[in-house]
Amino acid sequence: MSTQFDQVSVIKKANIYFDGKCVSHSVLFADGTKKTIGVIFPSTLKFNTGAAEIMELNAGKCRIRLAGATDWETYEGGQQFNVPANSSFDIETIDTLDYVCHFV
């Protein structure tokens, strides 16, 4: 994945979830696609998805459990994980997570 996004629009207003434990900004591309870039501070949270997502981790460490799974999987900076559409996942952030969420 690239280290920067060129020729994009960034929504100035932050998306703040879970009392500030997750903060992101929306990035809009000329082709109509959208991504969010943000951080998740150490916590355990549950996210619901509409569109399928690819979570690209730039830095930090977390454990995730997809809907219906019993086991947790560990991910860290330089890795990514996929979340199906209309689903959910639990995330335990061990070290502050710097991420890009790609909506697919």
Swiss-Prot record:
The gene is ppnP. Catalyzes the phosphorolysis of diverse nucleosides, yielding D-ribose 1-phosphate and the respective free bases. Can use uridine, adenosine, guanosine, cytidine, thymidine, inosine and xanthosine as substrates. Also catalyzes the reverse reactions. It comes from the Bacteria. This is Pyrimidine/purine nucleoside phosphorylase. CDD domains: cupin_PpnP-like (cd20296). Keywords: Glycosyltransferase, Transferase. It catalyses: a purine D-ribonucleoside + phosphate = a purine nucleobase + alpha-D-ribose 1-phosphate; adenosine + phosphate = alpha-D-ribose 1-phosphate + adenine; cytidine + phosphate = cytosine + alpha-D-ribose 1-phosphate; guanosine + phosphate = alpha-D-ribose 1-phosphate + guanine. Belongs to the nucleoside phosphorylase PpnP family. One of its GO terms (cellular component) is cytosol. One of its GO terms (molecular function) is uridine phosphorylase activity. PANTHER family: PYRIMIDINE/PURINE NUCLEOSIDE PHOSPHORYLASE (PTHR36540), PYRIMIDINE_PURINE NUCLEOSIDE PHOSPHORYLASE (PTHR36540:SF1). SUPFAM superfamilies: RmlC-like cupins. Its EC number is 2.4.2.1, 2.4.2.2.
